[in-house]
Amino acid sequence: MNIRPLHDRVVVRRKEEETTTASGIVLPGSAKEKPTQGEVLAVGTGRIQSNGDVQALAVKVGDTVLFGQYSGQTVKIEGDELLIMKEDEIYGIVEA
């Protein structure tokens, strides 16, 4: 996959969550909620400030990030379902 997001946009692949509940019930695809964690695959050059300077993004490729269930725009690229979102739609970075 070769995609380069512009400015303060980020490309994220959702991390699929377990399809079995804690009590052992298997959830069908329609009953699952969209995952709210994902891996950053690509980042833009940064946010353009009012004075013309470019502010680098806080997230980097490989980061695991948290975001809202309906954040970003879903796109299909080479069979992969990815999200393109602005950095300000990301709530935080999961640190290991």
From Swiss-Prot:
It is found in: Cytoplasm. One of its GO terms (cellular component) is cytoplasm. InterPro entries: Chaperonin_GroES (IPR020818), Chaperonin_GroES_sf (IPR037124), Chaprnonin_Cpn10_CS (IPR018369), GroES-like_sf (IPR011032). Keywords: Chaperone, Cytoplasm. The keyword Glycosyltransferase does not apply. Its main location: cytoplasm. It holds the Pfam family Cpn10. Heptamer of 7 subunits arranged in a ring. Interacts with the chaperonin GroEL. Belongs to the GroES chaperonin family. HAMAP family: CH10. Together with the chaperonin GroEL, plays an essential role in assisting protein folding. The GroEL-GroES system forms a nano-cage that allows encapsulation of the non-native substrate proteins and provides a physical environment optimized to promote and accelerate protein folding. GroES binds to the apical surface of the GroEL ring, thereby capping the opening of the GroEL channel. This is Co-chaperonin GroES.
